[in-house]
Amino acid sequence: NVVDASTNMPWYNGSTLLQHLEEVHVSGDRNLQDCRFPVQYVIRPQLDASRDFRGYAGRIASGVFKVGDEIVALPSGMKSTVSKIFVGEQSIDVAYPPQSVTMTLTDDIDLSRGDMIARENNQPDSVQELDAQICWMGEQPLNSATRYIVRHGTSEVKSMIREVMYKLDINTLHRDESDTNIGMNDIARIKLRTASPLLVDDYRRNRTTGSFVLIDPSSNLT
């Protein structure tokens, strides 16, 4: 039943493994609906000829951005319009994920690394309390007394572990709520609080803005 149907299983009328793999529906991994552009760098040339240029560089996390789109800068909430979009030095009209682009706006808005450009009627959630499933890769066990760094997109904030909800047994998928000792390669569900708000989406809808890296500041391990 891998490539051809087996005569040793007359009771099985389903498809072969190969047929299933060829026909199974795989949803796209690109979210083209929710416009999210985390700002990585603000470009301000020092040359006199370009002194008035202010560009916001980064990689599009999701959604489609077009010249003329009305946007909102987060977390400030200031509104503007996309004036130009560049890939390198080439000007384009439309940008898709995961393109790395530079955007200019019609208004001189104060944006910096870690901020986000989105749509006014479709914004990410601003939260400090996170409920997440993690895979711990550090040599030292997860320690609730340690102030870990959350790297989310282009922003980094300090955080504290509020609760280890359970550890997942990878052999049985049993959720062990009594075992809160999280060591290397363990998978666990945790609650944590960040020092400042993060702009997030549900992971099932947006893998980029719905995920983060938890870093041990003493070793830089995750």
Residues covered by each model-derived region:
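Canonical P-loop GTPase G-domain recognition
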Residues: 1-34, 38-43
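C-terminal effector/interaction modules appended to NTPase cores
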Residues: 45-222
